[in-house]
């Protein structure tokens, strides 16, 4: 069921989405996003850039699934205790949604690092995430840069020296991609993405695509996780699309 709400001339609607049932729909970017921006003309685009891609996701775990607590920057426990694999995956991805027995969730985000109470993840990941600390997130899927929240299938983590936060990119190979959500909703992607996050391993022409609670991305076959397997993207200049995607990545 779709309840369209017109605010000015915003393209976004409220869409029922079971994967985020614990959040008010007004605060859930995926529920608001119709993925219905028009195909761009040459007047809507500027520079073409060559990129290579990986993806990241939001782990969704039980609140008492292990013995490793999430801790804040003051080294205080935040409540959830995860398995080693779950803790390390959460640290690597930068956020985690903790589900309680009623199916309600709370999202925690990367807060920084401190040397106290490290968790040894070196058997799981080559990148050292052992000192990661967390905080409660503002957005239901986690937070990005500059007070942006993450929006599934829209947010890109970029090297901000190459792609400035707030930039909108159009990826032709993404247009028309079909994404089936747990709720049964089928998204037909319009090809537009928003630079709203960063990552320690994201350098130069490497972008990381946020795919929500999915753990893989067969719907985006252009993501090869190989720096030699590139694709083309275009910087978008359409002010309305930029404004709408900025709004989508902002809490209110």
Residue spans for each PLM region:
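Bacterial N-terminal signal peptides
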Residues: 6-13
